[in-house]
């Protein structure tokens, strides 16, 4: 398994969308299978995966945006948002987030 690193923006968003139990399930899912999400084209390697909230199914779930740095064993959780309330995040914004991570 890999280490999950929550970015400050992700932390601000996740508590409003997922219970602590759901957050644990999500982190386990991603750390056990870091390639589960689709790579967002032109994003610098950012991945996007759907996660179903309890009682909501995938259509009532969230999208989770994350970035793998598997060579050092880390997966960075970047964003999480309700599918019903937010459209796709533009690739150039995701690419900028990756650039920011590379300064960490």
What does each model-found stretch correspond to?
Residues 1-21:
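Arg/Lys-rich, positively charged N-terminal/basic patches that mediate binding to nucleic acids
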Residues 3, 47, 87:
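Residues that recognize and position ribonucleotide moieties
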Residues 7, 23-29, 37-40:
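N-terminal targeting/export leaders
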Residues 11, 20, 43-46, 92-95, ...:
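Membrane-topology and secretion signals of cell-surface/extracellular proteins
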Residues 37-79:
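Basic/aromatic recognition patch in beta-strand/loop cores that engages polyanionic ligands
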Residues 68-104:
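Enriched for short, Lys/Arg-rich terminal
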